[in-house]
């Protein structure tokens, strides 16, 4: 038993070293592509910096492709178009699993390894997922909201239905609310990839006297928080409303500092892309049978899920996150 533990430790160290250090096996003909939607979002700019950092360390090429706006159909087509480039590997964030699942399978059938990051399609042939435990992220936000509401109040959610990571977060919130019958979900509103729709809907709830009073607004994706905060800023009588956001772009962190956003649940898009490229590179140079199912294989060379973590940011620690963001942009 003692010897087995030592061997396991040495093996684990070897895997970590292979993913965190460059070596002569690489050449600049290798290309790794990240496919996503809403590429203009700050969230994906952070992911791009992680992808670029890993590519620089390994001396390989990287690219981010996908529609600038929220368009799941265009994302699936972009993935298919990328196959002609014969990339060494693909990272994919899934906007709609019914569209992206078949496209991922086409890539794998063509011999291109695929990992999902940020949002998953577990029923596809992707090898594994690197990202947030989105159910747990929802639980984290839900516990915070239940505490701030003292167990009672009306809540509106802003999301894009059918996007797997957002659906998982909503389930996390709902799981928490089961213990608080005084918390009611008034609406789960589809912003259709445009945070301006969240702004308009929030103004509706704050100004329409025929609408039910809403005590809290929850943003399940990264862009709506700033727009909901702006709506509250313009309505002086709404300072008692609670906003729980998602992710840590500058506008969201500033909203927390100014008091218009109570808290945000942050992720690590830099880490997802950084380790995603390195993992794909390892698969490219030490190939396995991509068409084989590894889900129930006790000797699988691949994990099922790599959790990059999530954290709650509020006024008590927002300065730390703002400082980290400023340092990263000044490099």
Predicted features by range, described:
Residues 1-10:
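Bacterial N-terminal signal peptides that target proteins for export
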Residues 19-22:
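C-terminal motif of bacterial Sec signal peptides marking the signal peptidase cleavage site
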Residues 24-30:
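Bacterial lipoprotein signal-peptidase II cleavage site
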Residues 35-49, 64-74, 96, 119, ...:
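Hinge/beta->alpha junction and helix N-cap segments in small-molecule ligand-binding domains
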Residues 89-108, 173, 192-255:
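Hydrophobic alpha-helical
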Residues 98-136, 140, 144-147, 154, ...:
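Flexible loop/hinge segments that line or gate small-molecule binding clefts
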Residues 176-177, 277-331:
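Hinge/cleft segment of the Venus flytrap/periplasmic-binding protein
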Residues 220-229, 257, 267-285:
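Extracellular/periplasmic ligand-binding modules, especially the Venus flytrap/periplasmic-binding
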């Amino acid at each position: 038993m003692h010897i087995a533990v030592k061997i396991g430790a040495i093996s684990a160290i070897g895997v970590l070293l292979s993913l965190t250090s460059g070596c002569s096996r690489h050449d600049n003909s290798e290309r790794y592509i990240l496919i996503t939607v809403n590429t203009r979002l700050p969230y994906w700019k952070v992911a791009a910096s992680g992808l670029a950092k890993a590519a620089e360390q390994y001396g390989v090429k990287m690219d981010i492709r996908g529609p600038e706006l929220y368009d799941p159909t265009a994302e699936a087509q972009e993935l298919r178009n990328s196959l002609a480039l014969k990339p060494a590997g693909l990272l994919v964030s899934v906007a709609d699993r019914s569209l992206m699942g078949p496209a991922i399978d086409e890539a794998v059938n063509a011999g291109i390894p695929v990992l999902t990051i940020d949002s998953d399609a577990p029923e596809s042939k992707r090898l594994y997922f690197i990202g947030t435990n989105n159910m747990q992220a929802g639980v984290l936000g839900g516990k915070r909201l239940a505490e701030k509401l003292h167990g009672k109040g009306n809540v509106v959610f802003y999301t894009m239905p059918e996007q797997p990571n957002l659906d998982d977060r909503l389930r996390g919130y709902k799981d928490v609310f089961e213990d608080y019958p005084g918390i009611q979900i008034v609406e789960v509103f589809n912003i259709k990839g445009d945070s301006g729709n969240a702004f308009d809907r929030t103004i509706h709830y704050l100004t329409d006297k025929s609408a039910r009073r809403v005590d809290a607004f929850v943003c399940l994706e990264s862009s709506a928080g700033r727009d909901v905060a702006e709506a509250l800023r313009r309505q002086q009588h709404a300072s008692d409303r609670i906003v729980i956001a998602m992710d840590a772009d500058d506008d969201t962190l500033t909203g927390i500092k100014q008091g218009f956003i109570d808290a945000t649940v942050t992720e690590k898009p830099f880490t997802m892309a950084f380790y995603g490229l390195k993992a794909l590179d390892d698969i490219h140079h030490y190939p396995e049978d991509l068409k084989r199912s590894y889900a129930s294989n006790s000797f699988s060379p691949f994990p099922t899920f790599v959790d990059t973590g999530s954290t709650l940011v509020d006024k008590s620690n927002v300065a730390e996150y703002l400082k980290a963001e400023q340092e990263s942009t000044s490099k």
